[in-house]
Amino acid sequence: MREIIHLQTGQCGNQVGTAFWQTIHGEHGLDQDGVFRGSDEQQSERLSVYFTEAAKQKYVPRAVLVDLEPATMDAIRSGPLGDFFRPDNMVYGQSGAGNNWAKGHYTEGAELVDQVLDVVRREAEACDSLQGFQITHSLGGGTGSGMGTLLIAKVREEFPDRMMATFSVLPSAKVSEVVVEPYNATLSIHQLVENSDETFCIDNEALYDICRRTLKQAHPSYGHLNHLVSRVMSGLTTGFRFPGQLNADLRKLAVNLVPFPRLHFFTVGFAPLTSSASFSNLGIAELTQQMFDPKNVMLASDFRDGRFLTCSTMFRGKVSMKQVEEQIQAIKNKNSANFVEWIPNNIQTAHCSVPPKGLDVSSTFIGNSTAIQNSFRRVGDQFSLMFRRKAFLHWYTGEGMDEMEFTEAESNMNDLVSEYQQYQDAGMDDEYGEEYEDEAPAEEE
C-alpha cells in the first residue's frame, strides 16, 4: 500500500494534527485504543495508508510528534487519544523555541532533529511503498516554523523522490499573538518554496470568521478552529484513505494542481458549514455554491481578487456525479473570469461514497489561486516594516543567523508574489502569454 508518514511539529502543529487523527480514526472505525470495530469493508481497505497494524488488530498512526517543550506532549498523553500514538514516536526537548525561528531551525531544533529523523527512518522502514510525508505546523511561532522547515529539508535530503505535503497555518493580521510572526513566516515560506511539493495554506483569521459568521460561535476556542481544520484535512486526504479514482495519492494530486513547481500553495475550503441544526440535507447545488464561496475558504484572501490556475473538488456521501459535473460546469461558466483560460479543464471532481462522521454529504475544495499572493504580500509588508528598522533582529543574529538570510527570504517571497501576478495577467493570445511561454522553462529551475 502507498503509505503516508505524518509529522506534527510545535504546539499548533500538534493540536491540529491530533484533531486530524481524532477525525480520521473515527471514519475508519477505530476506537480510542486503535482497535478496528468498523463494519464497512471500505473503512479497512486502505487503513494501512495512515495506520500500521501493531499487535492483535490494534492500529497505530504512522505519526511522529515533535515539539521543543514537553507541555504539548503531556496534553496529548492525558487527552482522549493518549494511548493511541506510539510513545516512542513522541520526541520533545525541554527548553522551547520562544517563538524564535532561528532557535527552531539552527540551535534548539537542530539538536533534536537527529532524534526525530531516527523515528522517521524507523517508520519509513515499516512501510511497503512509502508515497510521502505530510506535516502540520504553523509559520508564526518558533518550533513549527523553524524546526518544521528544518525537518522538511532533512527529510527531503534523505527521501528525495518522495512527496512532501504541508498543512501550514499562516499568521494573520487580526489574530496576531507574536510580534515577530512576519519574520518567522517569511523565513519559513522561503524554505517551503524550495522544499515542499504541495502546501495547503490555512489562517486563523479566516477560521475565526467562519466560526463567528457561519457557525455562530460567539467566542471560538482553538478547539473549534482545530476541528474545522481537521474536517478539511480529512476531506483532502479522502482520496488517499478510501478506494477512489481521482487524486488517489499525493503525487497525482500534485500533478493535477501544480502547473509550475514554485506555485504549489493552495487555498482550501469545506462545505457544509452551517450551524448544526440546519445542515441535515443539502443538495449538490448548495454544496457547490458553499464550497466556491470565499467565506468558506480557510484563508483570508478573497479568490475573486485573483484567478484559479487549477482546482480540485472532492464530494463525499451519496451524490450523483452527473449533477456534480453540471454544477461545477455552471460555476465555471458563471465565473469564467476567475479561471485562467490557458489551462483547459482545470477543475477536477472526485467522489467517495463514505461520508464524514455526522454528515450525509460533504465537499472539500482545493484551489491553486493567484489571489494567495495577497496573503504573502501582507506578511511581506509587515516583514519589511520591521526589517528596515532591524527591529528584534538581535534575537535571530544571536542564534548565529546572518542578515543576508533575511534579505534572501524577502526577495524569494517577492519573486513568488510576482510570479503569481504574472500568470494572473497572462492571457490566451496576448503577447504576455507568448513571452511567458518562452521564459517559463528557465524560470522553473
From Swiss-Prot:
Gene3D superfamilies documented for this protein: Helix hairpin bin, Tubulin/FtsZ, C-terminal domain, Tubulin/FtsZ, GTPase domain
Location relative to the cell: Cytoplasm, Cytoskeleton
GO term, biological process aspect, one: microtubule-based process
Keyword Cytoplasm found: yes
Positions of disulphide bridges: none
Known role: Tubulin is the major constituent of microtubules, a cylinder consisting of laterally associated linear protofilaments composed of alpha- and beta-tubulin heterodimers. Microtubules grow by the addition of GTP-tubulin dimers to the microtubule end, where a stabilizing cap forms. Below the cap, tubulin dimers are in GDP-bound state, owing to GTPase activity of alpha-tubulin.
Quaternary organization: Dimer of alpha and beta chains. A typical microtubule is a hollow water-filled tube with an outer diameter of 25 nm and an inner diameter of 15 nM. Alpha-beta heterodimers associate head-to-tail to form protofilaments running lengthwise along the microtubule wall with the beta-tubulin subunit facing the microtubule plus end conferring a structural polarity. Microtubules usually have 13 protofilaments but different protofilament numbers can be found in some organisms and specialized cells.
Full protein name: Tubulin beta-1 chain
Organism from which the protein derives: Colletotrichum graminicola (Maize anthracnose fungus)
Lineage start: Eukaryota, Fungi, Dikarya, Ascomycota, Pezizomycotina
